């Protein structure tokens, strides 16, 4: 084997070993163990949804050629499974009843699963997708129609929450082509707004943020530093923050 080929081999091997023994890998393994020891049947949850009405919605709002991400949410089987994992990762399947606000609630699958475990949920999203309008009605998910803007407070909801979530967040992209995004100052404003106006004293904010268009992590060194300065616990694409900036939040909180 040539020296250059041997070098590339060891570089790839070292990267694989680094991933295998990283903190993220250990935490991921712990997530899988927790799900395995406390299983939740996504199939049973799916069976509680009116499949005939869901199919009617699919037929009424067929796939759109230029809306791949929205089209994907018509696969309720897949997304119920995904959101069961979200519920398990936050230990919501074994927690006492909580008040939950879901930012960018989309089709409403997450809040629907939460309700089956006794939690009270409210979604916040724009009203541009007719399919989402239909599914949230079908699932009985309450939502507030609003758009999240940088440096702008969210609308007053008249209450505070035990948990505020945002899964597959994309509201921080200012332009559709994802070339312009929120600044660290915009994120700091947003986090402060959530903490002071929407979280109860022991509340948590969970953000799962989509990777960048090139597949790299959302958390650039600058953004990671900003979130960590706010007391965030960062795990892969997720950031968990407590109501109190000085506290280190936990995914397990029952």
Residues of each region from the PLM?
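Conserved class I S-adenosyl-L-methionine
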Residues: 97-106
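Conserved beta-strand signature within the Rossmann-like core of class I S-adenosyl-L-methionine
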Residues: 201-210
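Conserved SAM-binding strand-loop segment of SAM-dependent methyltransferases
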Residues: 140-151
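A short SAM/SAH-binding and catalytic strip from SAM-dependent methyltransferases
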Residues: 163-184
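Conserved alpha-helix/loop element of class I SAM-dependent methyltransferases that forms part
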Residues: 76-97
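A short acidic, Gly/Pro-enriched loop at the edge of an enzyme's catalytic core
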Residues: 154-163
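Conserved SAM-binding loop of SAM-dependent methyltransferases across substrates and taxa
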Residues: 107-118
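A short glycine-rich, Lys/Arg-flanked "PGG" loop and its adjoining helix->strand segment in the class I
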Residues: 180-201
């Amino acid at each position: 084997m040539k020296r250059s080929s041997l070098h590339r081999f060891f570089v790839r091997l070292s990267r694989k070993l680094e991933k295998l023994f990283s903190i993220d890998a250990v935490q991921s393994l712990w997530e899988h163990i927790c799900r395995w020891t406390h299983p939740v049947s996504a199939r049973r949850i799916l069976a509680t949804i009116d499949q005939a009405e869901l199919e009617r919605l699919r037929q009424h709002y067929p796939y759109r050629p230029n809306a791949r991400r929205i089209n994907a949410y018509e696969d309720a089987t897949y997304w119920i499974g995904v959101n069961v994992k979200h519920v398990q990762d936050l230990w919501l399947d074994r927690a006492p009843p909580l008040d939950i606000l879901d930012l960018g609630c989309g089709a409403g699958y997450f809040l629907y699963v939460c309700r089956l475990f006794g939690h009270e949920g409210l979604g916040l999203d724009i009203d541009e997708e007719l399919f989402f309008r239909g599914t949230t009605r079908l699932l009985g998910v309450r939502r507030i129609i609003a758009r999240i803007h940088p440096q702008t407070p969210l609308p007053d909801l008249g209450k505070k929450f035990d948990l505020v979530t945002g899964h597959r967040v994309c509201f921080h992209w200012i332009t559709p082509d994802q070339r312009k995004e929120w600044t660290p100052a915009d994120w700091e404003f947003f986090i402060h707004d959530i903490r002071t106006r929407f979280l109860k004293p022991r509340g948590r904010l969970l953000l799962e943020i989509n990777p960048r268009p090139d597949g790299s992590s959302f958390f650039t060194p600058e953004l990671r530093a900003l979130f960590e300065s706010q007391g965030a616990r960062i795990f892969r694409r997720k950031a968990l923050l407590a109501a109190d900036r000085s506290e280190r939040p936990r995914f397990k909180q029952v």
